[in-house]
Structure formats: structure tokens, C-alpha cells
């Protein structure tokens, strides 16, 4: 018998500003109910050279929104002959979620235009700009850690340590988070990617 359950990125996602840019991170588990459908999902979706979407919620819904954003921003960039702004991407994602309440999508849109930008978009579509943002089922376990330990002006190395600790903590406590840890650092000079396999998740 076929299951009607959606594949969920029930998830830990995080984005922070550091001294030169934005650092994003996520776990890699997706599931359908109690069944773990993938342990290596990439929840950090690149939609332009320097704008990413961190996805939590329904895999299908969040992938659809990300694909639409990528298409729209590519067309906008060509028509306007300008580099898309992070705020434009976030505002469009917020509008899509708000106007389609059946979508199960909580997103963080982060990147670098003229400065580092981090936007949190809730399941209902509300949009807020933050210095750091977390989302997904694992976020409940790391809010206190992030609130106490994040500080303005962290170096990239400090940011990587902060994000790795936060996602590791969520993986160790949230049954819906797991797998490996992926990160991307987005700055004026480009994008750097980091990967920690499951045996490198901090205990």
C-alpha cells in the first residue's frame, strides 16, 4: 500500500553572519514518517552565484520554490543587467509561501550582495532579517546555544566551529535530524564548501 506521507527534510538549518560574509549549514537526513529515505540530502540549495536557500519542510515543496527562485532571478538578472539582491529573493520566497498556504516550507535565504544578508521565512511566510537564523525540527534544541554563543565579527574559523557545534548538538538530540553536516561560506570573493561525514559529527 502506498504511503501518503510527504518526504520531509525534518531538519536542522542555520545561517550566520561572520566578519567577511555568511555561513550556512544543515544536516542531511530526510524521512517519510519513521522511514529515513536519505542520509545524504543536500539542503543548501544554490540559486545564484552568491544566494542560497536553506530548506526545511516538504522536500518537494522546498525544491519547487528553490527552482522557481533560480529561474526568476536568472531572468531578472538578464533583463535588468544587474546582480540579484538577497532581499529580492527572500521577498519572493515569502510571497510564494504566504499565497500558497498548502506549501510546507520553512526557509532561510542567505547570501552576499553588497553585504552579508540572512533572512528567515517561517512556515506561514513571515519574513525577518537576522544576524543569525535557525530552522527545522532541530532548531528547538539549539536556540539557547546560538543565542548565548553567537557574536558579531566572528572569523570564518570561529563561524565554522559555531555552526558545526550547533548542528552536531541538534543531530544528537533531534530524531528527525541526522547524517552528515554540510556548510557553505558565501563572501565577496565567492563560495567555499565544507563537509563533515557522520563520524565527524561532534558527540
UniProtKB/Swiss-Prot annotation:
InterPro entries associated with the record: Ntn_hydrolases_N, Pept_T1A_subB, Proteasome_bsu_CS, Proteasome_sua/b, Proteasome_suB-type
Compartments it resides in: Cytoplasm; Nucleus
Database matches in SUPFAM superfamilies: N-terminal nucleophile aminohydrolases (Ntn hydrolases)
EC number of the protein: 3.4.25.1
UniProt cross-references to CDD domains, sorted A to Z: proteasome_beta_type_6
Keywords: Cytoplasm, Hydrolase, Nucleus, Protease, Proteasome, Threonine protease
Active site: 11
Reactions that this protein is recorded to catalyse: Cleavage of peptide bonds with very broad specificity
GO molecular function: threonine-type endopeptidase activity
Pfam family, any one: Proteasome
Listed GO biological process terms: proteolysis involved in protein catabolic process
Primary location: cytoplasm
GO CC annotation: cytoplasm; nucleus; proteasome core complex, beta-subunit complex
Cleaved propeptide residues: 1-10
Recorded family membership: Belongs to the peptidase T1B family.
Cited function: The proteasome degrades poly-ubiquitinated proteins in the cytoplasm and in the nucleus. It is essential for the regulated turnover of proteins and for the removal of misfolded proteins. The proteasome is a multicatalytic proteinase complex that is characterized by its ability to cleave peptides with Arg, Phe, Tyr, Leu, and Glu adjacent to the leaving group at neutral or slightly basic pH. It has an ATP-dependent proteolytic activity.
Subunit structure: The 26S proteasome consists of a 20S proteasome core and two 19S regulatory subunits. The 20S proteasome core is composed of 28 subunits that are arranged in four stacked rings, resulting in a barrel-shaped structure. The two end rings are each formed by seven alpha subunits, and the two central rings are each formed by seven beta subunits. The catalytic chamber with the active sites is on the inside of the barrel.
Listed name of the protein: Probable proteasome subunit beta type-1
Amino acid at each position: 500500500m502506498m504511503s501518503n506521507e510527504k518526504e520531509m527534510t525534518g531538519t536542522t538549518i542555520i545561517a550566520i553572519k561572520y566578519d567577511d560574509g555568511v555561513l550556512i549549514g544543515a544536516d542531511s537526513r530526510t524521512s517519510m514518517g519513521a522511514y529515513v529515505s536519505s542520509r545524504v540530502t543536500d539542503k543548501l540549495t544554490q540559486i545564484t552565484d552568491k544566494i542560497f536557500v536553506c530548506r526545511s519542510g516538504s522536500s518537494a515543496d522546498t525544491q519547487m520554490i528553490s527552482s522557481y527562485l533560480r529561474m526568476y532571478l536568472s531572468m531578472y538578472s538578464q533583463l535588468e543587467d544587474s546582480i540579484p539582491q538577497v532581499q529580492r529573493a527572500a521577498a519572493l520566497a515569502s510571497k510564494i509561501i504566504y499565497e500558497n498556504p498548502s506549501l510546507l516550507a520553512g526557509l532561510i535565504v542567505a547570501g552576499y550582495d553588497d553585504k552579508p544578508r540572512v533572512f528567515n521565512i517561517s512556515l506561514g511566510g513571515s519574513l525577518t532579517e537576522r544576524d543569525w537564523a535557525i530552522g527545522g525540527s532541530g532548531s528547538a534544541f539549539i536556540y539557547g546555544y546560538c543565542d548565548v554563543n553567537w557574536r558579531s565579527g566572528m572569523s570564518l574559523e570561529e563561524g565554522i566551529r559555531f555552526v558545526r557545534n550547533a548542528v552536531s548538538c541538534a543531530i544528537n538530540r533531534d530524531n528527525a535530524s541526522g547524517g552528515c553536516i554540510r556548510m557553505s561560506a558565501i563572501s565577496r570573493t565567492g563560495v567555499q564548501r565544507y563537509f563533515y561525514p557522520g563520524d565527524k559529527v561532534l558527540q
